[in-house]
């Protein structure tokens, strides 16, 4: 479900050994967007209670990024997400937004 949710299925099917393909250190043979997808899948596979992300989809195109954000923020998932991102779509999916400037909270709003 995690691999499907972060849209890695077709990429994994294209690998010579599928999930058993050996990846070089730091994933140097992978695109930056696929690296982010792998990291996202790994972060959710064990269904944690809390997720911390920093620009988790910034290397993906907007449509794919938004679809993955929709999946990560779906109501069926019972985790709390704390995210720092420049992508405004995260705001649409949030119930609380904290804005910081120069290390200080300048806005704390519940939606």
Where are these regions (language model features)?
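Conserved catalytic loops of ABC-family nucleotide-binding domains
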Residues: 71-85, 91-92
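Conserved D-loop/post-Walker B switch-helix segment of ABC ATPase nucleotide-binding domains
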Residues: 58-71
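H-loop (His-switch) and adjacent beta-strand-loop-beta switch element
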Residues: 93-110
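A short, proline-enriched helix->beta-strand linker immediately N-terminal to the Walker B motif
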Residues: 45-49
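Conserved "ABC signature" C-loop
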Residues: 1-22
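Hydrophobic anchor residue at the start of the ABC signature
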Residues: 40
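Catalytic Walker B motif of ABC-type/P-loop ATPase nucleotide-binding domains
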Residues: 51-55
């Amino acid at each position: 479900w995690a691999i499907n949710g972060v849209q890695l299925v077709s990429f994994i099917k294209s690998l010579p050994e599928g999930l058993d393909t050996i990846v070089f250190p730091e994933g140097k043979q992978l695109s930056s967007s696929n690296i982010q997808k792998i990291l996202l899948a790994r972060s959710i596979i064990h269904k944690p209670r809390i997720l911390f992300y920093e620009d988790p989809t910034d290397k993906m195109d907007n449509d794919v990024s938004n679809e993955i954000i929709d999946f990560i923020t779906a109501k069926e998932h019972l985790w709390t997400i704390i995210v720092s991102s420049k992508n405004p779509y995260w705001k649409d999916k949030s119930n609380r937004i904290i804005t910081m400037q120069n290390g200080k909270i300048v806005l704390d709003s519940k939606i």
